[in-house]
């Protein structure tokens, strides 16, 4: 493979050639990768160009068609965040085919900031802060009457990249805590981890394969699979000694009516969780935070190697690790109440 990397116009000309050879966008992408390496456009970009070719538009130049309405741009960016709100500015810029500075400006205009590795509103409005505060007050009041942390089962999703380069420090304002952000290879393979756990450890997890997503139907089946794992690993629930208290976020696939019906059938109690609150979700502030550091500079060559690494990583964590993640909740609820619902640092 030579060191030559085609520019945008050259790459698009190659795609026209592939299009007329009746190649698919995916096949064309594989040919580009084989010839020029991983710096070529993503499959999604190739698919977008193929759609243009099918409509008869074979112009490979970036033309100004008039600036689209700002709300359209924001909707496009928001759609990417809805798909994966842990993406970096660079990843977002590459998908939108704009500069990283443009994404940074738009995120700022949309009022977004990264908290616990996820993009959330920079400035919560009064109603959002009040909801967070009220929710935490209710949970604290209940906890002080009688602890229920041992009954919490929580879970979430996280992208795992086959190649995760060295973590880079982020730049923050004076007085603000420094953070480190993994900058994975946008063009590399990745798999989505869906994991559920409690104070004693991991109960069940799945790795989604290429093209799979968490929609309502899949999430329903995941809950059924989780329930089966609970019956095997936590017999106290099968004996009805305890009722599951389920903590998950407000993603659309989690709040669909069909999912609510499934949770009701399972007789699980759903713990209140305010929107825009990754700082109050144990998977985000504890499990994934620790996992992210361990994943830095990891390289996987297959789906099976990712699974093997996860099995070993989960098993290497002692009971204290999982216990601590769940039992941090009251302290975080208190801090949220004390700050009138603002984000925790």
Curated annotation (Swiss-Prot):
<dbReference type="Pfam" id="PF01359">
    <property type="entry name" value="Transposase_1"/>
</dbReference>
<feature type="binding site">
    <location>
        <position position="249"/>
    </location>
    <ligand>
        <name>Mg(2+) 1</name>
    </ligand>
</feature>
<dbReference type="GO" id="GO:0003690">
    <property type="term" value="F:double-stranded DNA binding"/>
</dbReference>
<keyword id="KW-0255">Endonuclease</keyword>
<keyword id="KW-0229">DNA integration</keyword>
<feature type="DNA-binding region" description="H-T-H motif">
    <location>
        <begin position="89"/>
        <end position="110"/>
    </location>
</feature>
<keyword id="KW-0479">Metal-binding</keyword>
<feature type="site" description="Important for base-specific DNA-binding">
    <location>
        <position position="118"/>
    </location>
</feature>
<keyword id="KW-0460">Magnesium</keyword>
<keyword id="KW-0238">DNA-binding</keyword>
<feature type="binding site">
    <location>
        <position position="156"/>
    </location>
    <ligand>
        <name>Mg(2+) 1</name>
    </ligand>
</feature>
<dbReference type="GO" id="GO:0031297">
    <property type="term" value="P:replication fork processing"/>
</dbReference>
<dbReference type="GO" id="GO:0000014">
    <property type="term" value="F:single-stranded DNA endodeoxyribonuclease activity"/>
</dbReference>
<feature type="site" description="Critical for target DNA recognition">
    <location>
        <position position="186"/>
    </location>
</feature>
<feature type="region of interest" description="Catalytic">
    <location>
        <begin position="126"/>
        <end position="345"/>
    </location>
</feature>
<dbReference type="InterPro" id="IPR036397">
    <property type="entry name" value="RNaseH_sf"/>
</dbReference>
<dbReference type="InterPro" id="IPR041426">
    <property type="entry name" value="Mos1_HTH"/>
</dbReference>
<dbReference type="InterPro" id="IPR001888">
    <property type="entry name" value="Transposase_1"/>
</dbReference>
<feature type="region of interest" description="Linker">
    <location>
        <begin position="113"/>
        <end position="125"/>
    </location>
</feature>
<dbReference type="GO" id="GO:0006310">
    <property type="term" value="P:DNA recombination"/>
</dbReference>
<dbReference type="InterPro" id="IPR036390">
    <property type="entry name" value="WH_DNA-bd_sf"/>
</dbReference>
<dbReference type="GO" id="GO:0000793">
    <property type="term" value="C:condensed chromosome"/>
</dbReference>
<comment type="function">
    <text>Mediates transposition of transposon Mos1 by a 'cut and paste' mechanism. Transposases are sequence-specific nucleases and strand transferases that catalyze transposition through an ordered series of events: sequence-specific binding of transposase to the terminal inverted repeats (IR) present at each end of the transposon, pairing of the transposon IRs in a paired-end complex (PEC), cleavage of one or both DNA strands at each transposon end, capture of target DNA, and strand transfer to insert the transposon at a new site.</text>
</comment>
<protein>
    <recommendedName>
        <fullName>Mariner Mos1 transposase</fullName>
        <ecNumber>3.1.-.-</ecNumber>
    </recommendedName>
</protein>
<feature type="DNA-binding region" description="H-T-H motif">
    <location>
        <begin position="24"/>
        <end position="55"/>
    </location>
</feature>
<dbReference type="GO" id="GO:0046872">
    <property type="term" value="F:metal ion binding"/>
</dbReference>
<feature type="site" description="Important for base-specific DNA-binding">
    <location>
        <position position="100"/>
    </location>
</feature>
<dbReference type="GO" id="GO:0015074">
    <property type="term" value="P:DNA integration"/>
</dbReference>
<dbReference type="GO" id="GO:0042800">
    <property type="term" value="F:histone H3K4 methyltransferase activity"/>
</dbReference>
<dbReference type="GO" id="GO:0000729">
    <property type="term" value="P:DNA double-strand break processing"/>
</dbReference>
<dbReference type="Pfam" id="PF17906">
    <property type="entry name" value="HTH_48"/>
</dbReference>
<feature type="binding site">
    <location>
        <position position="156"/>
    </location>
    <ligand>
        <name>Mg(2+) 2</name>
    </ligand>
</feature>
<dbReference type="GO" id="GO:0005634">
    <property type="term" value="C:nucleus"/>
</dbReference>
<keyword id="KW-0539">Nucleus</keyword>
<dbReference type="GO" id="GO:0044774">
    <property type="term" value="P:mitotic DNA integrity checkpoint signaling"/>
</dbReference>
<feature type="site" description="Important for target DNA recognition and for strand transfer activity">
    <location>
        <position position="186"/>
    </location>
</feature>
<dbReference type="GO" id="GO:0006303">
    <property type="term" value="P:double-strand break repair via nonhomologous end joining"/>
</dbReference>
<dbReference type="GO" id="GO:0003697">
    <property type="term" value="F:single-stranded DNA binding"/>
</dbReference>
<dbReference type="GO" id="GO:0046975">
    <property type="term" value="F:histone H3K36 methyltransferase activity"/>
</dbReference>
<keyword id="KW-0233">DNA recombination</keyword>
<dbReference type="InterPro" id="IPR036388">
    <property type="entry name" value="WH-like_DNA-bd_sf"/>
</dbReference>
<dbReference type="InterPro" id="IPR052709">
    <property type="entry name" value="Transposase-MT_Hybrid"/>
</dbReference>
């Amino acid at each position: 493979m030579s060191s030559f990397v085609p520019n945008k116009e050259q790459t698009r000309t190659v795609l026209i050639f592939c299009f007329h050879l009746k190649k698919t966008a995916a096949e064309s992408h594989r040919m580009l990768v084989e010839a020029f390496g991983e710096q070529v456009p993503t499959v999604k970009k190739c698919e977008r160009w193929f759609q243009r070719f099918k409509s008869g538009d074979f112009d490979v130049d970036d033309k100004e068609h008039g600036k689209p309405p700002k709300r359209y741009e924001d909707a496009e960016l928001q759609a990417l965040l809805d798909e994966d709100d842990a993406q970096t500015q660079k990843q977002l810029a590459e998908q939108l085919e704009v500069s990283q500075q443009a994404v940074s400006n738009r995120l700022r205009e949309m009022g977004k900031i990264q908290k616990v590795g996820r993009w959330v509103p920079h400035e919560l409005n009064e109603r959002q802060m009040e909801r967070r505060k009220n929710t935490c007050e209710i949970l604290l009041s209940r906890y002080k009457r009688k602890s229920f942390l041992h009954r919490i089962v929580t879970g979430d999703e996280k992208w795992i990249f086959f190649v995760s380069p060295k973590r880079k420090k982020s730049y923050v304002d004076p007085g603000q805590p420094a953070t480190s952000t993994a900058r994975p290879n946008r063009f590399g393979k990745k798999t989505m981890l869906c994991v559920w756990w409690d104070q004693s450890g991991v109960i069940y997890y799945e790795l989604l394969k290429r093209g799979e997503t968490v929609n309502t139907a899949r999430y329903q089946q995941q809950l059924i699979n989780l329930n089966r794992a609970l019956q095997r690993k936590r017999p106290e629930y099968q004996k009805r000694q305890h009722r599951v208290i389920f903590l998950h976020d407000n993603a659309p696939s989690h709040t669909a009516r069909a999912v609510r019906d499934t949770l009701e059938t399972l007789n699980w109690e759903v713990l209140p969780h305010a929107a825009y609150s990754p700082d109050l979700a144990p998977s985000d502030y504890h499990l994934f935070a620790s996992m992210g550091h361990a994943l830095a500079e990891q390289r996987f060559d297959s789906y099976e190697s990712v699974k093997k690494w996860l099995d070993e990583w989960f098993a290497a964590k002692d009971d204290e690790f999982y216990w601590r993640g769940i039992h941090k909740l009251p302290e975080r609820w208190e801090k949220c109440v004390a700050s009138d619902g603002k984000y925790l640092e």
